[in-house]
C-alpha cells in the first residue's frame, strides 16, 4: 500500500512535471509571439521615425541651399542698390556743378555787359539804357 501510494505520488508528480513542461513551452511560445508583436510594433515606430528623420534631413539640406541662394541674391541686390545710390549721388553732384557753372556764366555775362556799357562813349550809353529798361 505504501509503495502504491509512493508510486501514485511519483506518477502524479511526473504528470505534473509534464503538464508544467507543456505549459512552460506554451508560455515561452506565447511570449515569443508577444515579444515579436512588441518588436514589430516598436520597429514600425522606429522605421517611421527614421523615415521622418530622413525627410527632415532632406528638407534641412534644401532649406540650407535655398538660404544660401537667397543670401547671395540679397547681397547682389544690396550691391546693385548701393551702385544705384552712388550713381544718384553723382547725378546730384553733376547737377550742382552745372548750376554753379550756369551761375558763374551769368555773373561773367553780367560783368562783360557792365564793362561793355561802361567802356563805350557817353553818347551810346543813353541808347543802351532804354534798351535795358525794356528788358
Curated annotation (Swiss-Prot):
Biological processes, Gene Ontology terms: endosomal transport
Residue runs in coiled coils: 1-27
Gene Ontology CC annotation, any one: BLOC-1 complex
A Pfam family assignment: GCN5L1
Subcellular location, record wording: Mitochondrion intermembrane space; Mitochondrion matrix; Cytoplasm, Cytosol; Lysosome membrane
Top-rank taxon, per record: Eukaryota
Subcellular location, principal: mitochondrion
Presence of the UniProt keyword Mitochondrion in the record: yes
InterPro entries named in the record: BLOC1S1 (IPR009395)
Keyword set, alphabetical order: Coiled coil, Cytoplasm, Lysosome, Membrane, Mitochondrion
The keyword Coiled coil is annotated on this UniProt entry: yes
UniProt subunit comment: Component of the biogenesis of lysosome-related organelles complex 1 (BLOC-1).
Its biological purpose: Component of the BLOC-1 complex, a complex that is required for normal biogenesis of lysosome-related organelles (LRO). May also participate in the coupling of lysosomes to microtubule plus-end-directed kinesin motor. May also play a role in intracellular vesicle trafficking. May negatively regulate aerobic respiration through mitochondrial protein lysine-acetylation.
PANTHER family for the chain: BIOGENESIS OF LYSOSOME-RELATED ORGANELLES COMPLEX 1 SUBUNIT 1, BLOC-1 COMPLEX SUBUNIT 1
Protein family per UniProt: Belongs to the BLOC1S1 family.
Name of the protein in question: Biogenesis of lysosome-related organelles complex 1 subunit 1
Protein source organism: Dictyostelium discoideum
Source organism phylogeny: Eukaryota, Amoebozoa, Evosea, Eumycetozoa, Dictyostelia
